[in-house]
C-alpha cells in the first residue's frame, strides 16, 4: 500500500474543488467529474510508484558503481601486499557483494 504525498492531498482537497466548483452546479456533470478525478488520482499514484522504482534503480546502480570501485581497490590491496588472489576469487568476492546489495535493494 502506497501513501500519498501531502502535496497531492493538498491538490485534491483544496485546489481541485475550487477549480471545479463552477462545474458541480450541474448535476449531470457530478458523476463524470468524480470518475475523472479518480482517474487522475490513480494516474498520480501510478506515476509516484514509477518514480519510486526509478529512484530505487538509480540508487542500486550508484551502489554497484561504488562497490566496483571498492572491489578494484580491494584487488589493488591484494596486489600491493603480494597476497595470492586470482581473478576467480576476485569475481566470487564481487559476486557476493553484488548479491548482498541486490537482496537489500529489493
UniProtKB/Swiss-Prot annotation:
Indicate yes or no for the key word Transmembrane.
Answer: yes
Residue spans crossing the bilayer = 7-27, 33-53, 74-94
According to the UniProt topology, which residue ranges lie Extracellular? 28-32, 95-106
The record's Gene Ontology cellular component field reads: membrane
Q: Where in the cell is it found?
A: Membrane
Q: Which residues lie on this side of the membrane: Cytoplasmic?
A: 1-6, 54-73
* Main location, first listed in the record: membrane
Instruction: State the superkingdom.
Output: Eukaryota
Q: Which UniProt keywords apply?
A: Membrane, Transmembrane, Transmembrane helix
Which named protein is this? Putative uncharacterized membrane protein YAR047C
The record describes its membrane topology as: Multi-pass membrane protein
Amino acid at each position: 500500500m502506497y501513501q500519498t504525498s501531502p502535496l497531492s492531498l493538498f491538490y485534491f482537497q483544496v485546489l481541485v474543488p475550487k477549480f471545479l466548483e463552477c462545474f458541480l452546479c450541474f448535476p449531470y456533470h457530478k458523476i463524470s467529474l468524480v470518475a475523472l478525478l479518480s482517474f487522475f488520482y490513480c494516474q498520480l499514484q501510478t506515476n509516484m510508484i514509477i518514480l519510486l522504482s526509478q529512484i530505487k534503480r538509480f540508487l542500486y546502480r550508484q551502489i554497484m558503481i561504488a562497490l566496483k570501485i571498492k572491489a578494484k581497490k580491494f584487488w589493488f590491496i591484494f596486489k600491493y601486499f603480494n597476497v595470492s588472489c586470482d581473478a576467480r576469487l576476485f569475481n566470487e568476492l564481487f559476486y557476493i557483494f553484488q548479491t548482498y546489495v541486490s537482496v537489500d535493494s529489493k
